[in-house]
Amino acid sequence: MSQLIRNFLIFFLFFSTNAFSADTEFFGKFVQGGVIIGKNKLAKKVFFDDLELELSDEGYFIFGFGRNHKKLSTLKINFSDRTETLNLDISKSEYKIERIDGLPSKMVTPGPELYERIKNDRLLIGKALGKKYKSKILPRNFVWPAEGRISGIFGSQRILNGLKKNPHGGLDIAAPVGTPIKSIASGKVLMAEKGLYYTGNIVIIGHGYKLKSMYIHMEDINVSEGDFVKQGQIIGTIGMTGRVTGPHLHMNVYWNRIKINPELLLEDKK
């Protein structure tokens, strides 16, 4: 059984008028930023808030909740002889808010000469996140991408000179330049690019089932777009490329293009 399954609790939820099958298992936290792995070997189709989920041959499926996900969602499972519906109660997460005033304006908002470059970078990233990769096996355990100190957490937000910036969408691990970066799970490299304004050197990997991981501010990139990688494979090294103040890895995890909390997905830190 995977570390994820060993560490996570099976949560008891509020059932709809239809009794939900005892054969359905859930692993994960029903909380904003959380990700759930479900399993039912008899399921024919599964829907999360009307979105049809991909089912593995073993009956596994995965879905997640963004930073500000609504309180209630619905999961529907179609069987050969019936349909069952479950109402999901999503707990609210608390996020750190930090205010910093007196910064030079260029550190808060980039100048207009950079707008076109930033726009093109975002288009490249959006294209990669929109790519589909199918896998027969749904990843159920995930390894930490690098050794180091956690220097930034999911959901936190800065207010710079009174201007609200986008919430922090991932996990920061501070470590010296050259520290190896590993893929958290097996998958296909959807993007491997250097020199983007905000992200610097960047790799995006698709793991199937609408799940993707992004690694940015890298020094070296050891993979190319289209490569297949194994879990734990070194894909590059930590750097300080892009818009950073020191060497670190910033990693995002996306489900269905929604950022989820990487710490709720990864194994216990060794």
Where are these regions (language model features)?
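Short hydrophobic beta/alpha edge segments that flank linear recognition/processing sites
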Residues: 173, 202-203, 230-242
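Sec-dependent signal peptide recognition
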Residues: 2-11
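Surface-exposed, glycine-biased beta-strand/turn segments
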Residues: 87-199
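Zn2+-dependent peptidoglycan hydrolase active-site motif and core
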Residues: 184-219, 247, 252
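Cationic-aromatic interfacial patches
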Residues: 21-94
